Amino acid sequence: MRVIVCTLIAAAVLVSGPIARGQGKARTLVAVWAHADDEGPVAPVLARYAREGVQVHMIIVTDGAQGAANTSVARGPEIARLRVEEARCAARALGVQPSILLGFPDGALGHYNADPALLYRVTQRVHEEIQRLRPDAVITWGPDGGYGHADHRMVSSIVTQLARAGAPGVPPQVFYSFLPAEGIRAMYPTRGVPPFVVPRAELLTVQVPFTDADLNAGRRSFECHKTQVSQEAIDRVIPAMRDTWNGQAPLSPMVPEAPAKDLFR
């Protein structure tokens, strides 16, 4: 993906009770992405949950072989290899579990609708991993895919389909990440904001507090994705995250609910 790092957005983490006190079974949060750098908008949230004792996993659906936004390396196997290392680096920076890499072709997921067999295969693989992890909550892209990216939109659709169908091991607690207009401008200062990609404010009912330490962990994770984002862009994005959210990152729940600050209600 062409870096979806920007004004981070996030999920909530008031992991009080058993997790914070180390009692009982730790809760599990799974983030499902198309590409290795898609965690950017919720990186501080993932860092905070991990810091508070939640088992945080990232499922990366594609091999990332077509993403060469910030490198002279040709698209293909070498980029894919580099992005595996970048995914590992980002997971370490956030303090989450090692990334789960499914290896589907980058840039191709949007075409899977035309082939029911391929669509079933990728849906089955995503379901297998979520079912194995049995999360209490899931984060993924919203239906807009952040800025309309077809791979992002397909991953969002798959996760939503599984949750709505009550697939075994998939909770209804699904939360959508998005790219705020300020983040898109910080990331791509020469481009405009695509139409119809930023959700209405009233849909962002989950406001997740994060600390400066969590934001710094997010910065370190962004810096891992050297083939995707420049240091100059990161230096614009991190202040945009901090200033836009003022310590609370918004997410949109799949199932509309009253305002909340916890993904595990």
What kind of region is each of these model predictions?
Residues V5-V15:
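Bacterial N-terminal signal peptides
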Residues R2-C6, I19-L29, P116-R265:
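Metal-dependent de-N-acetylase/amidase catalytic core
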Residues A20-L133, Q161-P168:
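Active-site rim/loop-helix segments in enzyme catalytic domains that contact anionic ligands
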Residues L14, Q66, G183-I184:
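Flexible loop/turn segments at secondary-structure boundaries
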